[in-house]
Amino acid sequence: MVRLTLDLIARNSNLKPRKEETISQCLKKITHINFSDKNIDAIEDLSLCKNLSVLYLYDNCISQITNLNYATNLTHLYLQNNCIPCIENLRSLKKLEKLYLGGNYIAVIEGLEGLGELRELHVENQRLPLGEKLLFDPRTLHSLAKSLSILNISNNNIDDIRDLEILENLNQLIAVDNQLLHVKDLEFLLNKLMKLWKIDLNGNPVCLKPKYRDRLILVSKSLEFLDGKEIKNIERQFLMNWKASKDAKKISKKRSSKNEDASNSLISNFETMHHIVPVYYPQVGKPKLVFFSEIQRYPVNGNASPESSREDYTKIIEEMGNLSLKQSESLLTKNDVHEPHLFHNPKEKENLFAENE
């Protein structure tokens, strides 16, 4: 294995010291260091590289992030495909803009507090134990809320990304090959991320849900690319018109339902008030009996106001109430109402029909 030292950097540097120029002075001029795929397993003191801005250390065997405290001018750090289990010792890198940590053993996104200039964070393809997923420390998310614009969290067994709502300036999110399942969770997130114009969710179960693409396009006006496919204006406008038409139909249906319920309520109220009326059927030669018959129901005008309908009902009921039993009896004579089926004697039926003839 190889350790990254100042001597190694000096020997592999393209910078040639001038006469009477020391190695220290030469190292101060270095801005880019590329030791990718060199079997490096540790980082030694780089404090002399004061102007270092870009450091390439990907595809090595580094197991711990160390000795970068004095590289305060570092803006780009490439540490993907190493053996790093946790994010640490980076808080002094106040100018860091891009951090690449994909392909390591990181289980929690943490330790990035104080990196107020960090714009890109790449933590895809972490080699996690079976069944585990990548987690986010709320403190780190809060510290990156205003700066982070690009986030790559692909292939990390993630099933919920609603915590990312705090990243108010995020404009690109790559979350391919995770376990995202619910469209509603994505709608919630897109409602919060007002500057997001690109999101890639290919390889998630949610992509197979009905109307998945349509729903995300409708909920986000800023989105321009979804799963690698451009969202054209004509597509968005068509979906917006379709949704407006659907919403209008729902409103119309609700209004019709309310009107119908109001009409049914009026009819129900009428039925419960004096719904039976005494009717006399005098029998020939028998004691007079009183039968009760249901009042006839009349359709209610849907346009009539509830007040006028109640007045009509009250009037009908009052007229019925004024009809006394004696008046009802006097209005019906033997010859007016006949109920042959009530006679027990057949001769009485024959006499009755003979009188009518």
UniProtKB/Swiss-Prot annotation:
PTM per UniProt?
Phosphorylated; in the testis.
Ordered alphabetically, the record's keywords are: Cytoplasm, Cytoskeleton, Leucine-rich repeat, Repeat
* LRR repeat boundaries on the chain: 29-50, 51-72, 73-94, 95-116, 117-138, 147-168, 169-190
Listed GO molecular functions?
A: actin binding; dynein complex binding; tubulin binding
Transmembrane ranges, per UniProt, are: none
The record's subcellular locations are:
Cytoplasm, Cytoskeleton; Cytoplasm, Cytoskeleton, Microtubule organizing center, Centrosome
Q: For the LRRCT domain, which residue ranges apply?
A: 204-242
GO cellular component terms attached to this protein's record: centrosome; cytoplasm; manchette; microtubule cytoskeleton; microtubule organizing center
PANTHER family referenced in this protein's UniProt entry, alphabetically: LEUCINE-RICH REPEAT AND IQ DOMAIN-CONTAINING PROTEIN 1-RELATED, LEUCINE-RICH REPEAT-CONTAINING PROTEIN 9
**What is the protein's quaternary organization?**
Interacts with PPP1CC isoform gamma-2; the interaction is direct. Interacts with actin, dynein, KIF5B, KIFC1 and tubulin. Associates with microtubules.
| Name of the protein this chain belongs to | Protein phosphatase 1 regulatory subunit 42
Q: Which organism is it from?
A: Macaca fascicularis
